[in-house]
Amino acid sequence: MSEKITPLSKTLTRRTFFQKIGGFITTHWLLTSTPFVGAGVLGWAGHDTLTLRHRQFDLFYPTLPNALEGKTICQLSDLHLETLRISPDSIYKSVMVQKPDLIVITGDIISDRTDLDKLNPYLGGLTAPYGKFVVMGNNDYSHLSHTLMKRYLQQFKTLEWTPLLNEASYLPNLKLWIIGIDDPATAHDNVDLAYQKILSSPTTQSNPVFRLALAHSTDCLDDVVKYGAELFLTGHTHGGQIRLPGLQPLITNTYLGDHGFYEGYHVINGIPLYINSGIGESIIPLRLNVPPEIAFFTLHKGDAPPRQQEK
């Protein structure tokens, strides 16, 4: 069933929120709790921050191109390498054990210019037979000058990753379009431009293609709906990052998140959408009740509902 959401609007930034909530938690929760409760909460958060989970989905499409049957897409998001405490080896093993056919990253790889030297250890060894693709997030832009951004993008290319900045790449052997939308949060997105190549490439019912859209944030969903996608992969929310038991996240930094769509798989306005909770952290180097994740999507021909496994 497809949920309907009204047009998007601006929201409170995660940085502003965490600066406020971090002080509140410290002064009014941890410090006023007994030492045992405070230590327990911090221990829980430490465990959640370092426990990398695998979320595996089987997705079914009646018109899936035959070449995509059984193919697996791996999604990484929001690594925030500056404060990331999960090792490169852990991420490498978690990804490569699944033997993905395609790997994508949906933004916020870095949180500081010093993170540029960490790209090779974390991303250099990852391989996929049909390629590796990346889009930018707000942190990628906010911490780099124009000159450093050029160097950053070149580093990805040197490591055999393909940056997609409002452009699409076609894999003819798979009949797959990968549409990379630049970061909406910093107003670098141009969905019309990202879909330009696809609009000039005719398709028919007898020759279907699969459109995989990538963006850091869901805040460009309205425009993606206009053009269509068989799967739209995003991140940015961190699943809330700090989520108290039984409660919705206090901040998600997106319009959809404020309406309850802050992580996981949904169909919204006809678009199958996945919001990745990410791997790293922002502002506060902890996660609570939102462990880091890597997502895998295996495509099948058929009309069955999605199936999910978690490890």
Predicted ranges, named:
Residues 32-67, 86:
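C-terminal segment of N-terminal export signals and the immediately downstream linker at the start
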Residues 70-80, 175-184, 212-216, 272-277:
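Active-site-proximal beta-strand elements of phosphoester/diester hydrolases
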Residues 218-295, 303-304:
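Conserved beta-sheet core of the metallophosphoesterase superfamily
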Residues 76-77, 103-107, 132-138, 164-165, ...:
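Active-site neighborhood of phospho(di)ester-bond hydrolases with catalytic His/Asp-centered motifs
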Residues 61-74, 161, 168-178, 267-272:
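Beta-strand-turn-beta hairpins that frame and shape the catalytic cleft
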Residues 71-154, 158-162:
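Membrane-embedded segments
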